[in-house]
């Protein structure tokens, strides 16, 4: 639920599902949590005179998560759009180090939940594009706090309407 969902949102909006917004925001915040953790750990480790191994680990974990999400998106498209066979997908998963049992579980999940990972990644890309628009439109008035507040106060929505709302916000302040 958004910060203003109960008081300022048209009731009809509560009937719609905005998977791209919800999962995109979730993945966006997951990614910045890795960045914040790496920054804090680098500062702490720097004061100890070490070479930042924990900060590097955070960066590697973020990249591993990116690879996982991207791989699952590609496999989802391969299965549901291009019609790839189960054996092809299992072979791909196993080539990335998953066991046969893990590969079967991932395959079953992808088969029964089409486009689930696309909501995460495409929503994340849209969230980043929206942030870049906010940086350009708000210029010196941009801050992550302001952007995050804008997204949360807008509440679940499609990205076209979020972009329109962003332009209205920029017009009011600019």
What are these regions (language model features)?
Residues 1-174:
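N-terminal maturation segment of proteins
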